[in-house]
Design a protein with these regions (language model features):
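PLP-dependent amino-acid enzyme catalytic core
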Residues: 1-259, 267, 276-304
Length: 304
């Protein structure tokens, strides 16, 4: 699979290159040349894999369609290292909670920082560490946050070899909880920088650095926000997992105790058993910059 810039640069790039680059040299976003098409047989196979082997196996199957420059065995180990009950609190990783007849809540906030962004950031941290070790390189991650992005990124990158994080945040304009999450980290590779101003001032600094290609290349600067295709790709997986659970009609595995349902909800569904792949499911997504919804759009483009 090759990737091209949305601004017209037709130079094909491989996944591991765009993972470390973030933005294309012309300022565009990297997208795959095409979206792999999933037929009914593949959906049936993925449903079975998710039921029998769990979320990490499903993630490997989907990521493999877009990543062909990491050996399959290595990619599978990365997925298995990332999506564990120890990190996300449940066997299902994204357990579904039934709120009413045909109405469910997919729990995406059971990760280390209690934000859905853990789902992709935890994978990014392991992908970065793997690829940087393979190349013998280091990466300086520069980001801007008003809360959950910074926390999720720092908890995913803390202690990772070859990675240093410099996270800008507006001074006095974050929630006390998320500020405590970030500023309490003592890892040597995590650097929090409070900026006098608002979030847009922080973001403007990051954009200015990203647009200075010579500076960016000299100091090996990368990104972890939703402009990085790897983050969006990781989020595609939980749309498939949610679909399989919502359309399951067989007894489920019990959700882990740490994944508490909302008040008034019935017990969790857990991983799916048998089900049908011709049912339609509507996903309603609270969204800020639309990256989360975009991942759902990619899943639908693939045939979900």
């Amino acid at each position: 699979m090759n990737y091209l810039s949305t601004r017209g640069d037709s130079t094909p790039r491989k996944f591991c290159d765009i993972l470390l680059e973030g933005l294309a040299p012309d300022g565009g976003l990297y997208l795959p040349e095409h979206y792999p098409q999933i037929d009914r047989t593949t959906l049936d196979h993925w449903r079975h894999l998710y039921a029998q082997h769990g979320y990490a196996t499903l993630a490997f199957e989907i990521l493999s369609l877009y990543i062909d420059d990491i050996p399959a065995a290595d990619l599978q180990r990365i997925c298995e290292k990332t999506y564990t009950p120890e990190v996300f609190g449940t066997l299902e990783i994204v357990p579904l909670k039934k709120l009413g007849n045909g109405f469910y809540l997919e729990a995406l906030s059971n990760g280390p920082t209690l934000a859905f962004k853990d789902m992709a950031m935890q994978l990014l941290g392991n992908l970065f560490e793997y690829e940087l070790a393979r190349r013998g390189e280091q990466l300086n991650i520069l980001g801007a946050t008003s809360g959950d992005t910074g926390s999720a990124a720092e908890y995913a990158m803390r202690g990772k070899q070859g990675i240093r994080v410099f996270m800008l945040s507006p001074h006095g304009r974050m929630s006390a909880f998320q500020q405590a999450q970030m500023f309490s980290l003592q890892d040597a590779n995590i650097h929090n920088i409070a900026v006098e101003g608002v979030f847009d001032d922080c973001q403007d600094i990051v954009k200015a650095v990203s647009n200075d290609l010579a500076f960016k290349r000299q100091y090996k600067i990368g990104t972890v926000n939703s402009i990085n295709w790897a983050r969006l790709l990781a989020q595609v997986v939980y749309y498939f997992a949610g679909y399989f659970q919502a359309t399951s009609h067989a007894p489920m595995l019990r959700a882990g105790a740490s994944a508490l349902p909302p008040e008034g909800a019935v017990p969790g569904l857990g991983r799916p058993g048998a089900g049908r792949n011709d049912e339609k499911v509507d996903f309603t997504v609270p969204s800020g910059n639309f990256g989360n919804v975009c991942a759902g759009h990619v899943a639908r483009q693939m045939g979900l």
